[in-house]
Amino acid sequence: MDLKMLLIFIAFLLPSVLGFPIQDNYENSTATTESTQVTTEEDIYDSPSPAETDSEDELIFNRILEVNKDSSQYLQEGDIVPRRSRSAINCRNCYWPQSRDGIVRIPYVLDPTYEENHVKGIREAMAEFETLTCINFVKRKTERDYLIIRSADGCWSNYGKVGGGQTISVMKGGCMWKGIIQHELDHALGFLHEHSRSDRDKYVRIMWEYISPADRPDFKKFENSNNLGLPYDYSSVMHYGPHTFTNTTGKATIVPVPDGSVHIGQRLGLSNLDVAKINRLYNCSRCSTIIDAAFGSLKSANYPRNYSDNTNCVWLIRTRSRKISLHFRAFELRTTRGCQGDYVKVYDGSSKYSTVLMDKTCGSQIPTDVVSSSNLMLIEFVTDGADTASGFQATFTSAKIQRRFKIRN
């Protein structure tokens, strides 16, 4: 094979190599996936289009089904504990109460048999809710209604608040993936699977011929579902994969319409529309955007015109197992002592509990480039009620993470 043909062959293979996703597994290591979408603050309702392959995508959802197949817990739709009396849709008391400060605090207790890495993974999954929405998971004191997160026999949850202590099963060894943990927590917040929406027939076709009679109830459509006035989300963390419950190898059970090539389902983490739905259901006024991309840009609202007073916005950048490099192209924030008024802050992770990469920064001097240690970076922009300025504009790129290995004799 001559050099020209070899280069063509490598160019053909390269996209496939780069497109292989790495999942968030808290038994081992942490990573996410990316797409080529570039998202800005104004695109809060635009969810990313996952770039992972069907087989890898379904590996995550099939993990739930595989783990749950031997579960002694009776489940609907693969991972939902059915209610004994109240309707799963028309249940006004199924939502967690909101405090006067606008925060929805949900008490929880963790299984004492969890090891340190399990606890860390569960809390990281919770922290993304707290960063992107007004949902805060807090350790239980004496509250009557709370979550019991334990390693039972499977990955499953109740729908919404049921009263008293309610179990979310996050089994060690099978369910310790960020997307799965967030999926089950989302059920507890009051969300069903995306394909159960009343308007689903406009967006997907259920291929009943490839679904066994015993599994058909798992594809039930709720005619009176509350869709919150938000679009159908193919990339929701609550969406089935295309081959879920298929009885014929290679045949899809859910096909997008009118474009059958649209990618559906993932278990990697909350999408922008997942976040928007939580905030709308719980009447949260949060400014948050998820950017799943290898490169892109972001800017303060109204840039290059002046930003608004009393702003609190975050951008969560997620890439596929790549370090993120953030470069500020323009920077003009009102100067205050210690930057206690308007500021930009950057974290080395997906929440405000993560290590700080760039502490509160204001003024007109462009900050130096910021590089994450992993595939996650959070940018926070806060302003007070005083004077404003033009704000900032930034771009980001990503590079493969270099892993170090110790050689043992």
From Swiss-Prot:
Essential cofactor(s): Zn(2+)
SUPFAM superfamilies: Metalloproteases ('zincins'), catalytic domain, Spermadhesin, CUB domain
Limits of the CUB domain: 287-399
Tissue: Expressed in ovary and gonads.
Chain ranges passing through the membrane: none
Binding locations of Zn(2+): 183, 187, 193
EC number: 3.4.-.-
One Gene Ontology cellular component annotation held by this UniProt entry: cortical granule
Keywords assigned: Cell membrane, Cytoplasm, Cytoplasmic vesicle, Disulfide bond, Fertilization, Hydrolase, Membrane, Metal-binding, Metalloprotease, Protease, Signal, Zinc, Zymogen
Highest taxon, organism lineage: Eukaryota
Cofactor binding summary note: Binds 1 zinc ion per subunit.
Signal peptide coordinates: 1-19
Pfam family of the protein (one): Astacin
Paired cysteines (S-S): 91-94, 134-284, 155-175, 287-313, 339-362
GO BP terms: cell adhesion; fertilization; negative regulation of binding of sperm to zona pellucida; positive regulation of protein processing; prevention of polyspermy; proteolysis
Positions of the catalytic residues: 184
Location in or out of the cell: Cytoplasm; Cell membrane; Cytoplasmic vesicle, Secretory vesicle, Cortical granule
PROSITE patterns in UniProt: ASTACIN, CUB
UniProt region (Disordered), positions on chain: 30-54
Function noted in UniProt: Probable oocyte-specific oolemmal receptor involved in sperm and egg adhesion and fertilization. May act as a protease.
Protein name (Swiss-Prot/TrEMBL): Astacin-like metalloendopeptidase
Species this protein is from: Gallus gallus (Chicken)
Organism taxonomic ancestry: Eukaryota, Metazoa, Chordata, Craniata, Vertebrata
Gene behind the chain: ASTL
